[in-house]
Amino acid sequence: MSVEIHVNNLGGWPVQEDRLAQACRTVFVEEEVSEGEVSVTLMGDEAIQAMNLEYFDKDWPTDVIAFSLHGADEPVLGDVYLGYQQARRQADELGISLGEELLRLVIHGTLHVIGYEHPEGDGRFECDMYRKQEALLESLSRT
C-alpha cells in the first residue's frame, strides 16, 4: 500500500497532526484504496472563507472543503482544507472536543476525495456517506 498523507498546519495550531493523517489512512484502508496522496491543510476563517467564495460562491467560513484531483483508474489524489476556527466553534456547539471534530472533518473530506458525495440540506445526515463517516470516526476512537 502506497498512501502519502501530508498535513499542513498554516496557523501553527495545537493539533495532533499524526491523528489527522491516521484518519485519512483509515479511510483508505476501510475503502480498500491502496494508492493515493492527500494533502490536509488547516487554515483560518479568512483563508477558508476566501476559498468558499471563490469555488462555491458562498461568502462565509466553512468547516471543510475537499477537491478530488485524480481521474478514473488513477491513484487517488486530493486536497482537504479544514477551517480550524469553524471546527472549534462547531465542537463548542456540539459539546465535543476539537480533536474529535477535526477527525470527523478530515474523514468527511477524505471520503469526498475518494468519490463519495452527499445531498445538501438536512437529508445529508441520513445518507450513506454520513453513516460511513460516523462509523469510521467510531473505529478511530477505539485506537
Region spans (language model):
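An acidic/histidine-cluster motif and surrounding catalytic segment
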Residues: 1-102, 111-143
